[in-house]
């Protein structure tokens, strides 16, 4: 079982969309996937629950609210969810730096943090890296945080200006981005469809946008498998 946490202290950067695309790609490969949604907005859950009713390969979990700010309580609550064996676990987090995200960072094998060529999003990755360092310290891990963090560069629509070029170079040079995914209208609207790409094509939807989404999903899953040599 591999545990992947999608995280950034900056909200609205596309964590839930990337998490869903990743799940979509893994499901098409025949993997058994569990999603854990720690974002109070529940965006990933809203996409996944209808699919889980149709596919036993997808499991959806939401951690019950814990009033305590104890790291140990949140960490142990996640451990309890992970007791049911699956091939992959994908954790979606809120755009914050609360104790739930700290636990999600501590429990995972890999952190994926999306960023476009915007200073606020790059700073969100940098803050997430520092928070990951804190999380690893909490569990006594000596793994270097940079070894666990992978940045997915999200290429915006239109032509980038000079500042965007600078930010893109920073993302690749400093963080070593693993992918370049185009923020197309099809991908950004993916969560609202509440079905997998394969289901949408089978249902008779225009295949073109879904094939683009599948290509993006495949890039993500190939990157994941490359990280773990699986």
Regions found by a protein language model. Give the residues of each.
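Pre-Walker A (Motif I) flank of P-loop NTPase domains
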Residues: 1-4, 160
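P-loop/Walker-type NTP enzyme "switch/lid" segment
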Residues: 3, 7-9, 13, 21-90, ...
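Conserved Walker
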Residues: 17
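Hydrophobic anchor at the start of a short beta-strand
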Residues: 32-33, 89, 111, 146-148, ...
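Inter-motif core of Ras-like GTPase G domains
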Residues: 100-119
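Anionic-ligand binding region
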Residues: 123-152, 161-170, 174
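Beta-strand-loop-alpha "switch" segments that mediate conformational coupling across diverse proteins
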Residues: 154-200
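NTP-binding/hydrolysis catalytic cores, primarily Walker-type P-loop NTPases
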Residues: 197-230
């Amino acid at each position: 079982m591999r545990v992947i946490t999608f995280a950034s202290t900056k909200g609205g950067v596309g964590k839930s969309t990337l998490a869903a695309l990743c799940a979509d790609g893994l499901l098409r490969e025949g993997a058994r996937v569990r999603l854990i949604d720690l974002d109070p907005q529940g965006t990933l859950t809203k996409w996944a629950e209808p699919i889980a009713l149709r596919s036993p390969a997808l499991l959806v979990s939401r951690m019950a609210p814990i009033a305590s700010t104890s790291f140990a309580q949140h960490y142990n609550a996640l451990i309890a969810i992970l007791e049911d064996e699956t091939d992959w676990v994908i954790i979606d987090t809120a755009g914050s730096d609360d104790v739930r995200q700290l636990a999600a960072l501590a429990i995972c094998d890999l952190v994926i943090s999306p960023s476009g060529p915007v200073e606020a999003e790059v700073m969100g990755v940098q803050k997430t890296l520092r928070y990951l360092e804190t999380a690893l310290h909490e569990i006594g891990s000596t793994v270097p945080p940079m070894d666990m963090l992978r940045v997915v560069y999200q290429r915006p629509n239109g032509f980038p200006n000079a500042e965007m070029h600078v930010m893109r170079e920073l993302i690749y040079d400093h963080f070593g981005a693993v992918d370049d995914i185009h923020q197309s209208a099809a991908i950004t609207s993916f969560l609202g469809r509440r079905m997998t790409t394969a289901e949408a094509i089978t249902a008779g939807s225009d295949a073109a946008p879904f094939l683009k989404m599948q290509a993006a999903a495949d890039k993500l899953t190939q990157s994941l498998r490359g990280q773990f040599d699986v």
